[in-house]
Amino acid sequence: MPRLSHRTAHDNRNGRNHVNTVKHIKASRPALAAAAAAVIGGLAVGAALSADDLRLADNPFAPAYGHEYRHGAVPTREAKLHMDEWDRVHGASAARLRRHTVLAFGGGIDGIGVTSGTPKVYLVFYGSQWTGGGDPNGAATYLQNLFTGLGTGGEHWSGTITQYCDGPTVPRGATTCNTANTPHVGYPSVGALAGVWFDTAAPSPSSATISQLAQEAVNAAAHFGNTTAASNRYAQYVVVSPSGTHPDGFGSANFCAWHSYTTSSYGDLPYTNMPYVTDLGASCGENFVNPGSAGRLDGFSIVNGHEYAETLTDQLPAGGWTTRSGSENGDLCAWISSGQGAAANVSMGNGAYAMQSTWSNDTSQCDISHNIL
């Protein structure tokens, strides 16, 4: 079986490793904001960076800081507060850039910018723990239902994503798409789920590395028979780790999930590192929309929905649609609890799921619902 190429990129190119211990959210939002300010006050911040120079990965509280392979990472809710406070301290212009600058096309990588066809999501449940107590909250069934439901029942959450495009007629730096002659992100009218694999041949590592996660995506492509670049053109592989594991340091790092891609003899393979997010409770979205037992799995649909949407619009980072600072469509709308773009239940053909909004260039805001283009 082919192994991933050395170009998996997305090796750690830093030497810096800023890690914050993640604790469940128990304090009030004002208390968390005060704590964030106190932490910021303890940093030697130096001269402020200009808005033109600042990148998302420059924020020391961002999951991508020192780990630039963590594309579109969902920060824990605590980390998001720290990130926003750091932006504030370093000047409102930087914060405005990250929140309000439109997404622009990155020109594509290997001719690929977005998933300009019907999305195909392959769920990969990584490790024998999935059949031995590694799924105490029923996440496997929930995720299968989520991706089966997307695009059904007239849901318009997916509509926001369909405005983004790629192709030879789309110039690098474009912020709009010609609806008549450019291929756009496809709408999954019969659901996005293309396959499910419980890879129980061996236990999932306690702390899977990026190389192990990328290799699991390659293994999944082989399992599903997707062994050509054409068969992977509109595919994404969600590598879901079981409860009690810490892929890429999950639990001691400051993220809930991230996406990336690897190269292989099967073509470029987009994949998501999807930890068992209920292990971090409210920090990764438990009960963010729904109270009690109804919201126990909110984090799985919010976080995986974030990464799914970003993979569709920036399939091989960062050749797709990002801001000048490196944010993707999900990053701009993460953890909004009220007002425009607030996370909400999205009704699909098989039920309702807690989802976050995503950025819409054509309305200049975070939209939880949008016309299908």
Question: What are these model-derived regions, one by one?
Answer:
Residues T21-A35:
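Bacterial N-terminal signal peptides that target proteins for export
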Residues A34-A44:
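Bacterial N-terminal signal peptides
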Residues G46-G107, Y126, L150-T160, C165:
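N-terminal zymogen propeptides
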Residues G117-V121, N232-Y237, G267-P270, L297:
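Loop/turn elements at helix/coil->beta-strand transitions in domains of secreted/extracellular proteins
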Residues K120, Q129-G195, T323-S327:
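Active-site-surrounding "flap" and adjacent substrate/cofactor-binding loops of secreted or lumenal enzymes
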Residues G127-G132, V170, P242-D248, Y276-G281, ...:
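Solvent-exposed loop/turn segments at secondary-structure junctions
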Residues A174-T262:
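Active-site-proximal segments of metallohydrolase catalytic domains
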Residues Y266-L373:
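Catalytic cores of secreted/periplasmic or lumenal enzymes
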